[in-house]
Design a protein with these regions (language model features):
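Short, intrinsically disordered N-terminal pre-domain segments
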Residues: 1-18, 114-122
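A structural detector for beta-sheet-dominated domains
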Residues: 9-11, 45-47, 85-89
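Short, acidic/charged, Gly/Pro-enriched secondary-structure junctions
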Residues: 59-65
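A generic structural signal for short, non-catalytic loop/turn and secondary-structure boundary residues
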Residues: 1, 37, 53, 75-79
């Protein structure tokens, strides 16, 4: 079981997310964490993808109120999600080897690359 609460730091601002007790409907082996204002969520789950393969997911979501660009008097919640899925066999790779792949992937996600992705580059 992960720590409770979990601290997620975004742009040098720490956010405390407490376990809510709910699970992700798509996976009974999951947990949901949220800030007290419910504007940030962290979802963690594990699913069996194949007989010997597990799909582990960690997903961060943040929502905010945003004005309609065509009608400033109308505001709605908008959400952005960032997540990582690690699909791994139940045997054959050590936790250290998987972590090395994750750390390499995280290093790839520079500000420049994220900007290019948001610009629609492939």
């Amino acid at each position: 079981m992960l720590a409770d609460p979990i601290t997620l730091t975004v742009n040098a601002v720490p956010f405390t997310l407490n376990r809510t007790g709910e699970t992700d409907q798509s996976s009974p082996n999951s947990s949901v964490y949220a800030t007290s204002d419910l504007n940030r969520h962290l979802r963690v789950s594990h699913q069996t993808a194949k007989i010997d393969t597990v799909r582990s997911l960690i997903r961060s979501e943040v929502r905010k109120v945003s004005a309609d660009p065509l009608n400033a008097s109308i505001s709605t919640y908008k959400t952005v999600s960032v997540y990582l899925v690690i699909e791994h066999p139940t045997a054959g790779f050590s936790t250290t080897e998987i972590d090395q792949e994750v750390q390499g992937f995280k290093a790839l996600l520079t500000t420049s690359l994220v900007g290019e992705l948001m610009g629609g580059e492939v």
